Amino acid sequence: MLFRSVVNKPRFGCGHNGAPFTSPLQSLLQCYQCVKQDEHISYGDLGRAVPPFGCAFSTVPGMSHVLAVANEEGIVRLYDTECGDMQRLVVKEFMAHTNAVFDIAWVPGEHKLVTASGDQTAKLWDVKAGELIGECKGHQCSLKSVAFSKFERAVFSTGGRDGNIMVWDTRCNKKDGFYRQVNQITGAHNAIDKQTPSKVKKRKPSIRGLAPSVDSQQSVTVVIFQDEYTVISAGAVDGVVKIWDLRKNYSTYRQDPVPVKLFPYPGNSTRKLGYSSLVLDPTGTNLFASCTDDNVYMFNATGLKTDPVSVFRGHQNSTFYIKASVSPDGQFLLSGSSDHSAYIWQVSDPLAAPINLIGHCQEVTSVAWCQSDFTKIATCSDDNTVRIWRLNRSSEDSSESNKTDYVGWACKKKFEPSSMAAILCTPGKPSMIPSSSLMSSPTPATCAPSNTGDLPLPSSTPLSALLPTSKLQTPKRINNGGLGASPKQMSSSKISIKDWVTRTPKSSKGTDSKTPSPRKAFTPVEQYPIVSNARVQLPYEKRAKRRLETSSEDVEHVCLDNCCVMELEPRLKKSKLDLCSLNERDCRDDKCLRLSDLSKEFDQELSPSPSTSLHMNATDNPPTLSPLSEMKSDFVDKENSSPEKNWLSALGHKFKSDNSSPQFKSSSSPSSRNSTSKKHQPRNAPNSPVSVPTTPGSMRKICTYFFKKSE
């Protein structure tokens, strides 16, 4: 138990009586502090302060307290974190690149390190002598990440903004004085993720004198080694973490590379998001990925599931410079943040509030946890400083005057209840508040539909009116025919859109109809009005038998009066018959039945005159219905009539009866047939009962009623 022995030291962990520290290890996290002597300013070549971009503790046995820091101007400094003398604090300093150094990595167990720079190269350095061992060339854009394998000291990997992942081996011979990549993954994180290889790519000819184009859609932000043959990488915009098998030579085929495994973006953001840091725990099982959606996702790198095991929240990640680190025992996660603080989470309890390392005044970018000393943490910030945080439990007993020497301290972050509810809970339906006596609801006036389409305005409604009911009750009518009390209102969570609409007042001017009350807004609205059985049937003369407007000035036109207009009744809407064309074409035939007479008889029987109605009331015997009246009843109820009833047969019977009478023969003379006065005959044609033969032989063909006979 290395860390128990560390915290049990008299300086850090023991109490006043020398008893060992038995509290949980996470209780010590609030004891991290930074004093003025542990705050170091990062200077550039000309002596001005520049921000540091990368830091890493040495992996050499006996030199794990040495911290390497690289800044924006390409200078690398080695700090001895155990030295109390400020004059000998910096062990080594050298200009590694003429451009910014974005990442730095120590060779496992050796006094060597590799720097990744914006000058498109990576360099291998001997830190003891301060000499350059070799330079790696191959990338066409800035290098963003560099990583070594724990099992191989000569092999490392780099990722750049050109979208390529390159593997280097320092045991290979140099070509033209530079190391060349032994394996390459081209387009590892394109914006469009393709699961299958595409067609062979065509290489574009390079133009001399022009810098290569930078495609921000395929930048590789971080690469790490999982084992000797496996590399894990992440991109800037695709939101996918990919695992690659280096035993496959990806540079042989000019196709889109296919990873052996990938972790898709687990969040719900629609923006193009990426990852700024990847880190494995000491066992190599848990993979921590810092995403730009302000979350750190923990994946199981050795399992089959691609969903995150845990999610760590509370910090802010708005740039690709924010890095993460894991404690030596793998129990805690350290990360930088854009809100000027560093955060520490407990891996076993991701929902617990993290610990804040407060003191920086700008974004905290790179962080490092000493792998041989749990009590030491290093942070880099855009305020141009590097700070060393130490675990000091003696500060609990110190006075307030001694705390003025501190430039940084740790405290537990307090989550706001509203923010925690938004993170952990899904927004649900609003519930009723029992403590309030009034609840906002629409006013009666605004429940009625309006032309503007505005939403209902709030008003105060007692909660007693919002009690749930078993079903809606129909409003009762009072004695004078008006509307009674409005039905009980439904709960606000059960009201549908149709319950907000009320029926508009009818256009009828009857005295018995009244405008519905606006409080009837919560009753169901019917699409068509229901006609009461007690409704008084008005005579047909008073009903709307409207004529169509025409440009003809002949008011005696029989077509307009009898055959082309239908009464506006629901049962007659679909029984319209255009008799005008038949009348104009067939009335020229001397054997043809005049449709004007037929229409006249139809109107007379459909709308009897007042004198006829009085005569019928005076007599006891009802009049005998003619076959024409039977045809009229069939015509009126055409939609509901049976198929056996045929109006053409009635016309045939009428034609036979008129043909047998001498009155019809005299009217069918050539002189009367050629005159135009037959088209406008008087409308008082005789209406007498006709005996209808029932034998099929007496019936004529239908063509004789519509075509003229040849003379």
From Swiss-Prot:
InterPro entries named among the record's database cross-references: G-protein_beta_WD-40_rep, WD-repeat_CDT2_adapter, WD40/YVTN_repeat-like_dom_sf, WD40_repeat_CS, WD40_repeat_dom_sf, WD40_rpt
Protein name (record): Denticleless protein homolog B
Motif annotated as DDB1-binding motif, chain positions: 168-171, 244-247
Biased amino acid composition, Basic and acidic residues: 631-642
Region annotation (Disordered) ranges: 473-524, 601-698
Keyword field: Biological rhythms, Chromosome, Cytoplasm, Cytoskeleton, DNA damage, DNA replication, Nucleus, Repeat, Ubl conjugation pathway, WD repeat
Organism in which the protein naturally occurs: Xenopus laevis (African clawed frog)
Localization per Swiss-Prot or TrEMBL: Nucleus; Cytoplasm, Cytoskeleton, Microtubule organizing center, Centrosome; Chromosome
Biased composition (Polar residues): 504-516, 606-627, 684-697
Biased segments, Low complexity type: 658-675
Pathway: Protein modification; protein ubiquitination
